[in-house]
Amino acid sequence: MMEEERFKAEIFHVTQEVCNRTASELTESESRNVIVDELFCVGVTEMVWEQIRVLAKDIEAFAEHAGRKTVQPQDVLLCCRRNEGLYEIINNFHKESIKSKKKKKENSTT
């Protein structure tokens, strides 16, 4: 349980930073005083946490359906297939990761 609490605390911290930054930007651009309530950040954190849990279960189910016990990048890509922007970001990250590993392997053998 300690690890879960640590992850949730980190999500809360990032959520609070994003909300406060956005509030500051709105305050500057619209000349309105925008204040972020801490309970709002708690609510957003809970939504994000629950979404992470659902996503993890879906990714594990895709791997299991493919007859694997280990999650592969294609499971993650399959899970985000309906969000074109996210799919592109993750796919590009995966391709760059493969290229980087190949370069390291080539450099270590020469």
Swiss-Prot record:
Main location: nucleus
Entry keywords, A to Z: DNA damage, DNA recombination, DNA repair, DNA-binding, Meiosis, Nucleus
Record GO terms (molecular function): chromatin binding; DNA binding; protein heterodimerization activity
Annotated GO CC locations: CENP-T-W-S-X complex; FANCM-MHF complex
Subcellular location: Nucleus
Residue ranges crossing the lipid bilayer per the database entry: none
InterPro entries: CENP-S/Mhf1, Histone-fold
GO biological process, one term: resolution of meiotic recombination intermediates
Function statement: Component of a FANCM-MHF complex that promotes gene conversion at blocked replication forks, probably by reversal of the stalled fork. FANCM-MHF promotes non-crossover recombination.
Family, as annotated: Belongs to the TAF9 family. CENP-S/MHF1 subfamily.
Subunit structure: The MHF histone-fold complex is a heterotetramer of 2 mhf1-mhf2 heterodimers. Component of the inner kinetochore constitutive centromere-associated network (CCAN) (also known as central kinetochore Sim4 complex in fission yeast), which is composed of at least cnl2, cnp3, cnp20, fta1, fta2, fta3, fta4, fta6, fta7, mal2, mhf1, mhf2, mis6, mis15, mis17, sim4 and wip1.
Protein name: Inner kinetochore subunit mhf1
Organism the protein comes from: Schizosaccharomyces pombe (strain 972 / ATCC 24843) (Fission yeast)
Lineage: Eukaryota, Fungi, Dikarya, Ascomycota, Taphrinomycotina
GN (gene name): mhf1
